[in-house]
Regions:
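Generic hydrophobic, helix-prone segments enriched in Leu/Val/Ile
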Residues: 16-17, 23, 52, 85, ...
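Short aromatic-enriched loop/helix-cap "lid" or pocket-rim segments at secondary-structure transitions
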Residues: 28, 108, 134-135
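A structural motif corresponding to the C-terminal end of an alpha-helix
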Residues: 87-88, 148-157
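C-terminal intrinsically disordered extensions
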Residues: 112-116
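Canonical Radical SAM [4Fe-4S] cluster-binding loop centered on the CxxxCxxC motif
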Residues: 4-46
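Core AdoMet radical
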Residues: 33-48, 54-74, 85-103, 117-146
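Alpha-helical scaffolding segments of alpha/beta enzyme cores, especially the outer helices
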Residues: 50, 76-83, 107-111, 144-151
Length: 157
């Protein structure tokens, strides 16, 4: 599985697919994302360190995706992301976050801000048709409105 790439066209950035402890929601009907996980933090860190070693900083932006939300990555990996950003002059990092973790976003942004790194949070809303999103896709946002979602998410997909 390829875990590093460079996106050159729309919103140029480097992107890494890291491995974490797995999505805690695991109910989205269309998703097999949660299958790429490992409960061994040291194994995850070793794999993630190999992937992050490929980052060059070419666009000063890094997108970090994983088998869940940013909070499913171990602390050593999170520290290595910060170190990589500092060493490669990356000023903006994009992370994914499921709605169930939205209260953890401010602490993440503050931690990275201490290192002069801007954090952008992306969440997979998929649709604002609440009935379809919750009863068919099983996304777990409840009746959250776009206004509520934008209080923690900078980007939606």
């Amino acid at each position: 599985m390829e875990r590093y790439s460079v996106l050159k066209d729309k919103n140029p950035r480097e992107i890494v697919l890291l491995r974490g402890s797995g999505c805690k929601w695991k109910r989205c009907t269309f998703c097999d994302y949660h299958l790429d996980y490992c409960l061994d933090e040291e194994d995850n860190y070793n794999l993630n360190a190999q992937v992050l070693s490929k980052v060059t900083g070419i666009y000063n932006k890094l997108e970090v995706i994983n088998s869940g939300s940013f909070c499913d990555l171990d602390n050593k990996t999170m520290d290595l992301i910060i170190k990589t950003c500092e060493e490669k002059n990356i000023s903006t990092v994009h992370f994914e976050c499921h709605y169930i973790h939205h209260k953890e976003v401010p602490a993440l942004k503050e931690k990275f801000k201490e290192h002069n790194i801007n954090v952008r949070i992306k969440t997979g809303v998929e649709t604002f048709d609440v009935d379809y999103r919750e009863n068919v896709m099983k996304k777990g946002f409840g009746k959250s409105t776009p206004e509520k979602i934008r209080t923690y998410a900078d980007e939606v997909c």
